[in-house]
């Protein structure tokens, strides 16, 4: 028997996943296009936290959006980083006047999108900082700079979110 997939059409899977996420957790988050937004963001009087990445491993980063965790995630297509403009839009949306921390996984596409977004954010006058994960020791084919930093991202999300909620400054977070 041939294995079936829970996919209606490959070209709409990301949009459908995000709609489903919004329907499953309406009390925690909202979905606006390819942005997953914490319901807690509206009242945020603190440093806010944004991350981004390709879809395909849901709930992945989007599953960490919500009260006490991430504020916004920009979602790319399957295994592809979102473009820099979408990441910038996420930072702009998240900015509540105390600064925005952009958490980046160490993948080439994510690095490129983050660099573009940071350039746009600085040009717009946003107070932003970027942290790139890179702790992974299992996967290191070309040297230390290529460590993906996937596993440590979850701990980083928790630590940064806790510091932000304690009222720490952007540099402290």
Where are these regions (language model features)?
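Alpha-helix capping and helix-loop boundary segments enriched in small/acidic/polar residues
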Residues: 5-8, 56, 75-82, 105-109, ...
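Gly-rich Lys/Arg/Thr-decorated short loops/hinges at beta-loop-alpha junctions or inter-strand turns
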Residues: 2, 44-52, 61-74, 137-141
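N-terminal amphipathic/basic leader segments beginning at the initiator methionine
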Residues: 1-49
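Short glycine-rich or small-residue beta-strand-to-loop segments that form or flank ligand, phosphate
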Residues: 4, 47-54, 70-73, 99-108, ...
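Glycine-rich oxoanion-binding loops at beta->alpha junctions
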Residues: 57, 64-97
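Short glycine/serine/threonine-rich phosphate/pyrophosphate-binding segments
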Residues: 58-61, 85-88, 109-115, 138-141
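Short alpha-helices
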Residues: 131-171
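A structural-propensity feature for long, helix-poor, extended segments
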Residues: 88-106, 112, 145-158
């Amino acid at each position: 028997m041939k294995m079936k997939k829970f996919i209606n059409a490959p070209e709409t899977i990301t949009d459908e996943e995000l709609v489903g996420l919004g329907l499953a957790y309406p009390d925690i988050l909202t979905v606006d296009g390819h942005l997953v937004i914490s319901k807690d963001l509206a009242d945020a009087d603190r440093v806010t936290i944004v991350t981004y990445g390709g879809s395909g491993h849901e709930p992945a980063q989007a599953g960490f959006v919500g009260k006490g965790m991430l504020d916004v995630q920009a979602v790319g297509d399957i295994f592809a980083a979102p473009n820099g403009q979408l990441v910038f839009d996420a930072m702009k949306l998240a900015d509540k006047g105390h600064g925005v921390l952009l958490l980046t996984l160490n993948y080439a596409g994510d690095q490129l999108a983050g660099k573009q977004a940071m350039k746009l954010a600085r040009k717009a006058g946003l107070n932003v900082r970027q942290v790139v994960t890179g702790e992974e020791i299992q996967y290191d084919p070309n040297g230390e700079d290529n460590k993906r930093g996937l596993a440590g991202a979850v701990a980083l999300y928790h630590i940064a979110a806790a510091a932000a909620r304690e009222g720490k400054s952007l540099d402290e977070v």
